[in-house]
């Protein structure tokens, strides 16, 4: 079985489920999953996991995402986008200065109430199904993070503004648009929504598909991305034959500090070592470069000899992904084990 990622661009007008069906028809009997459903009226990046890559989907779901969206001011729809019915209007339209200035109010940790027309479940039933039946939907507020928000364009004639945002998982852009409009003493809904990035997957190198006849299986595989690609900014350990066998069979596996831990900071990280031999402790400062700005930022990692704990890292064997998991006092606890070769041992 092939194991890789596909960076697919979902066009507007089809559902994420329909796109999954299209990809399945192209690839045949292969295990497939995707990270982060997009609304029918939305377009943009929808990463696909093939084979063993499906075991890593949860990491992409947690990844930061970027969107470009356009808000129409002066009206509100029941769905928060142009697919819904107009339920309220207001004559107050913000100025260009106000549309730009409001962004700073939303950057940081934000509490957001998801829209009634969402896939969240209420007592086991999808919220959007209840909303379509005209039933009242009450969803609990959620804590999300807006890392960046800026206005790209303001069209006074059409009463619209286009925004760019980088946000955490669980962020509803339709709700963000409504909240922006309310903060400007107006109403608003999304008329265009495009997801431009999910983790490492960007729109400039995405594969665009509208039907199974547009591309062959070989062409898809030629544009595939290696399964380890999304792990490049996560700490990694190399396993010996005996360690790999222990992990493979779910046994307790210990890593030696002196031999294994000095090389944790690899790939996107640069390692700076600072030691205090009297206290027998070490502090690692991992410095990562932000590709979009060229700036670097530090990720502190406190390490005590023989008692190192890491929430998430991956283990490879002979250059191949073996498992992801956590490290507790030098003991590796696997979360997922991968079968990427037929004859591992």
From Swiss-Prot:
NCBIfam families: RPE1 (TIGR01045), TruB (TIGR00431). Residues 261-309 form the RPE1 insert domain. Responsible for synthesis of pseudouridine from uracil-55 in the psi GC loop of transfer RNAs. The keyword Isomerase applies. Keywords: Isomerase, tRNA processing. It comes from Rickettsia conorii (strain ATCC VR-613 / Malish 7). Its EC number is 5.4.99.25. It catalyses: uridine(55) in tRNA = pseudouridine(55) in tRNA. The active site is at 39 (nucleophile). GO terms for molecular function: RNA binding; tRNA pseudouridine(55) synthase activity. GO terms for biological process: mRNA pseudouridine synthesis; tRNA pseudouridine synthesis. Pfam families: TruB_C_2, TruB_N. This is tRNA pseudouridine synthase B. It comes from the Bacteria.
């Amino acid at each position: 079985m092939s194991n890789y990622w596909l960076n697919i661009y979902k066009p507007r007008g089809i559902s994420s489920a329909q796109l999954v069906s299209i990809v399945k028809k192209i690839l045949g009997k292969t295990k497939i999953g995707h990270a982060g459903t997009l609304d029918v009226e939305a377009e943009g990046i929808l990463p696909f996991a093939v084979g063993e890559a499906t075991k890593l989907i949860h990491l992409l779901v947690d990844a930061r995402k970027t969107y470009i969206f356009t808000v129409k001011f002066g009206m509100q729809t029941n769905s928060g986008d142009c697919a819904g019915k107009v339920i309220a209007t207001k004559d107050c339209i913000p100025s260009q200065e106000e549309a730009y200035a409001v962004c700073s109010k939303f950057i940081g940790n934000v509490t957001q109430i998801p829209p009634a027309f969402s896939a969240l479940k209420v007592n086991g039933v999808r919220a959007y199904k209840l909303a379509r039946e005209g039933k009242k939907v009450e969803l609990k507020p959620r804590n999300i993070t807006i890392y960046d928000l800026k206005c790209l364009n303001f069209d006074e004639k059409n009463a619209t503004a286009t925004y760019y945002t980088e946000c955490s998982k669980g962020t509803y852009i339709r709700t963000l648009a409504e909240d922006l409009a309310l903060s400007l003493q107006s109403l608003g809904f999304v008329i265009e929504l495009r997801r431009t990035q999910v983790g490492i997957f960007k729109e400039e190198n995405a594969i665009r598909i509208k039907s199974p006849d547009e591309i062959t299986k070989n062409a898809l595989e030629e544009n595939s991305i290696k399964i380890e690609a999304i792990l490049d900014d996560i700490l990694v350990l190399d396993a010996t034959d005996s360690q790999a066998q222990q992990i493979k069979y779910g046994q307790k596996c210990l890593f030696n500090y002196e031999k294994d831990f000095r090389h944790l900071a690899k790939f996107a990280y640069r390692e700076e070592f600072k030691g205090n031999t009297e206290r027998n402790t070490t502090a690692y400062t991992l410095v990562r470069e932000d590709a979009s700005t060229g700036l670097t930022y530090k990720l502190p990692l406190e390490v005590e000899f023989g008692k190192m704990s890491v929430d998430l890292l991956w283990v490879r064997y002979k250059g191949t992904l073996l498992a992801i998991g956590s490290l507790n006092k030098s003991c590796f606890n696997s979360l997922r084990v991968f079968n990427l070769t037929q004859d591992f041992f």
